[in-house]
């Protein structure tokens, strides 16, 4: 009761077409509700009248009132203000144009729904624009399920930093905290919100942005994602009609990103690649006039007659610094393992219906031998440098080459402690038989044929039986011994899997929290107890220290 008495309630009147903007600090949590019958929206999701809507710390957002309205806020944050400058009318116009395309597609007058790419510099509000457009589509009551494509690994819509994802939300997406801006994937506990179980497929880049070094890996990942979305549209007519929204990284604004050596004058190559892969028909540019002009002049854009639309950057978009981004990344990884955090008692105990945020997950920590968990890196190599090769020689390695990590090496080389690993499914056909093992099998086969030939020449049944048994025994023994040696060498030096597994859809994520060099074991944090679904993992550059 004492905690309830410290909760301060403040009423705020909003003019028609105005926004109430707020920025929560590390020690600020609020809950709000609308006291008027007229609708109030947060990222185009309508607030339920008189129901408390909790918002967790570090969140920066805004409420929009198309008509005059009154809201009530608990524990008014230090940074908040009301503004009549808003981009909601522009977003609504975009939505109406896309809704028309969906309806025409449903009637058979268009092949598919809108496919929209959203571009802009850092802190321009790309994810927020995408969230608004998705919520506007979901709020029509037409049963749309638009695809939300997350190509910004520094601001993942559903999972953790370093990941790319495809999700298909079917209900308006709430705004409660930094994690899961476009809905959370299914978990082992009951969902906290109606959009808590969003179907999500993920791929692992293992970095916060695409670069010229990982451009080839990026291209393959995007192609796999586009293929997965195409298969979904073939099976689900509604998904094809609903269309998709594609969030892009800020690095896409760099003209030379992904430019190849054989075509140094090419510009926006990764942008063009994504346009072709997902068959984009509309590009939305936020606030960047030069980018808008450059994209309009791209040969691919002109040949496909794409719509390139520029909208202003919202005045409520907050310029985030490195500390803000690091805070968001830590929160996102922690939420993946521990679930959504609980709100303080003075907010969760408010009288009135509200969305609960008190279902935490229970991650599982255990040890696993080095020999059982195969940790790989994509696009890296530990061979001798070019300077150590013979004069005139050069290294020719696949950009998708897999390299096995040796945990017994120096820490600055291994780089596994506190690293996030992506688990990938490995099938029997993904296994590569080492060269030595193949040679041993051939020797066994030849030996067996020779023995059979000698036995047939003898023509004696008793000797034939003895000879055959002896030959098989020797062959099997020799093969087993050689195979063991080959596997031992393979475990330490070669990667016994095809390169394709490095860019495959991932099954989940784990974190290596400790490395025991004496016992030769990892200590691993997994979101669920029990055995891992696979023992092959891909490492990247994403770190997270479990401070729980």
From Swiss-Prot:
<feature type="binding site">
    <location>
        <position position="60"/>
    </location>
    <ligand>
        <name>ATP</name>
    </ligand>
</feature>
<dbReference type="InterPro" id="IPR032324">
    <property type="entry name" value="Clp1_N"/>
</dbReference>
<dbReference type="InterPro" id="IPR010655">
    <property type="entry name" value="Clp1_C"/>
</dbReference>
<keyword id="KW-0067">ATP-binding</keyword>
<dbReference type="InterPro" id="IPR003593">
    <property type="entry name" value="AAA+_ATPase"/>
</dbReference>
<feature type="compositionally biased region" description="Basic and acidic residues">
    <location>
        <begin position="437"/>
        <end position="481"/>
    </location>
</feature>
<feature type="binding site">
    <location>
        <begin position="123"/>
        <end position="128"/>
    </location>
    <ligand>
        <name>ATP</name>
    </ligand>
</feature>
<dbReference type="Pfam" id="PF16575">
    <property type="entry name" value="CLP1_P"/>
</dbReference>
<keyword id="KW-0507">mRNA processing</keyword>
<dbReference type="InterPro" id="IPR028606">
    <property type="entry name" value="Clp1"/>
</dbReference>
<feature type="binding site">
    <location>
        <position position="19"/>
    </location>
    <ligand>
        <name>ATP</name>
    </ligand>
</feature>
<keyword id="KW-0539">Nucleus</keyword>
<protein>
    <recommendedName>
        <fullName>mRNA cleavage and polyadenylation factor CLP1</fullName>
    </recommendedName>
</protein>
<comment type="similarity">
    <text>Belongs to the Clp1 family. Clp1 subfamily.</text>
</comment>
<dbReference type="GO" id="GO:0051731">
    <property type="term" value="F:polynucleotide 5'-hydroxyl-kinase activity"/>
</dbReference>
<feature type="compositionally biased region" description="Acidic residues">
    <location>
        <begin position="482"/>
        <end position="494"/>
    </location>
</feature>
<feature type="region of interest" description="Disordered">
    <location>
        <begin position="437"/>
        <end position="500"/>
    </location>
</feature>
<keyword id="KW-0547">Nucleotide-binding</keyword>
<dbReference type="Pfam" id="PF16573">
    <property type="entry name" value="CLP1_N"/>
</dbReference>
<dbReference type="GO" id="GO:0005849">
    <property type="term" value="C:mRNA cleavage factor complex"/>
</dbReference>
<dbReference type="InterPro" id="IPR032319">
    <property type="entry name" value="CLP1_P"/>
</dbReference>
<comment type="subunit">
    <text>Component of a pre-mRNA cleavage factor complex. Interacts directly with PCF11.</text>
</comment>
<dbReference type="InterPro" id="IPR038239">
    <property type="entry name" value="Clp1_N_sf"/>
</dbReference>
<dbReference type="InterPro" id="IPR027417">
    <property type="entry name" value="P-loop_NTPase"/>
</dbReference>
<dbReference type="InterPro" id="IPR038238">
    <property type="entry name" value="Clp1_C_sf"/>
</dbReference>
<dbReference type="InterPro" id="IPR045116">
    <property type="entry name" value="Clp1/Grc3"/>
</dbReference>
<dbReference type="Pfam" id="PF06807">
    <property type="entry name" value="Clp1"/>
</dbReference>
<dbReference type="GO" id="GO:0016887">
    <property type="term" value="F:ATP hydrolysis activity"/>
</dbReference>
<dbReference type="GO" id="GO:0031124">
    <property type="term" value="P:mRNA 3'-end processing"/>
</dbReference>
<dbReference type="GO" id="GO:0005524">
    <property type="term" value="F:ATP binding"/>
</dbReference>
<dbReference type="GO" id="GO:0006388">
    <property type="term" value="P:tRNA splicing, via endonucleolytic cleavage and ligation"/>
</dbReference>
<comment type="function">
    <text>Required for endonucleolytic cleavage during polyadenylation-dependent pre-mRNA 3'-end formation.</text>
</comment>
């Amino acid at each position: 009761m004492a905690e309830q008495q410290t909760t301060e309630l403040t009423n705020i009147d909003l003019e028609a077409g105005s926004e109430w903007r707020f920025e929560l600090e590390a020690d600020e949590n609020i809950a709000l509700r609308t006291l008027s019958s007229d609708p109030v929206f947060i990222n185009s999701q309508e607030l339920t009248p008189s129901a408390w809507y909790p918002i967790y710390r570090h969140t920066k957002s805004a409420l929009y009132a198309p008509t005059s309205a009154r809201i009530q806020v608990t524990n008014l944050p230090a940074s908040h203000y009301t503004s009549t400058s808003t981009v909601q009318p522009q977003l609504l116009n975009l939505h109406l144009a896309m809704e028309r395309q969906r309806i025409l597609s449903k009637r058979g007058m268009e092949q598919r729904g809108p496919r929209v790419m959203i571009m802009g510099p850092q802190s321009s509000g790309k994810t927020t624009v995408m969230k608004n457009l998705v919520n506007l589509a979901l709020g029509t009551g037409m049963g749309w399920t638009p695809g939300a494509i997350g190509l910004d690994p520094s601001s993942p819509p559903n999972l953790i930093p370093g990941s790319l994802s495809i999700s298909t939300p079917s209900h308006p997406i709430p705004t409660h905290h930094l994690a899961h801006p476009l809905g959370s994937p299914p978990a082992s506990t009951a969902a906290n919100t109606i959009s808590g179980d969003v179907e999500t497929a993920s791929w692992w880049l293992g970095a916060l942005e695409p670069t010229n070094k990982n451009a080839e890996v990026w291209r393959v990942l995007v192609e796999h994602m586009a293929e997965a979305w195409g298969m979904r549209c073939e099976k689900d007519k509604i998904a094809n009609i609903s269309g998709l929204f594609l969030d892009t990284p800020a690095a896409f604004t760099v003209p030379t990103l992904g430019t190849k050596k054989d075509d140094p004058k090419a510009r926006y190559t990764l942008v063009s690649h994504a346009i072709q892969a997902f068959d984009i028909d509309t590009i939305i540019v936020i606030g960047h006039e030069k980018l808008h002009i450059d994209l309009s002049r791209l040969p691919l854009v002109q040949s496909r007659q794409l719509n390139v639309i520029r909208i202003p950057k919202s005045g409520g978009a907050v310029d985030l610094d490195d500390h803000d981004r690091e805070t968001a990344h830590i929160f996102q990884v922690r939420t993946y393992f521990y679930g959504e955090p609980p709100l303080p008692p003075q907010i969760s105990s408010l009288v009135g219906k509200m969305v609960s945020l008190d279902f935490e997950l229970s991650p599982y920590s255990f040890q696993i031998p080095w020999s059982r968990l195969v940790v790989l890196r994509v696009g890296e190599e530990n061979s001798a440098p070019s300077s150590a090769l013979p004069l005139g020689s050069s290294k020719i390695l696949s950009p998708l080459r897999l390299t096995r990590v040796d945990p017994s090496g120096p820490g600055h080389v291994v780089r596994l402690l506190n690293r996030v690993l992506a688990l990938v499914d490995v099938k029997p056909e993904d296994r590569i038989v080492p060269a030595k093992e193949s040679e041993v099998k051939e020797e066994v086969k030849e030996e067996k044929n020779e023995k059979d030939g000698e036995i047939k020449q003898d023509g004696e049944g008793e000797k034939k039986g003895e000879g055959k048994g002896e030959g098989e025994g020797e062959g099997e023994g020799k093969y087993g011994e050689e195979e063991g040696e080959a596997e031992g060498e393979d475990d330490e030096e070669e990667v016994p899997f095809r390169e394709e597994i490095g860019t495959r859809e991932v099954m989940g994520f784990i974190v290596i929290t400790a490395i025991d060099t004496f016992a030769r074991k990892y200590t691993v944090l997994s979101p669920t107890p029990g055995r891992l679904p696979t023992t092959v993992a891909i490492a990247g550059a994403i770190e997270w220290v479990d401070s729980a």
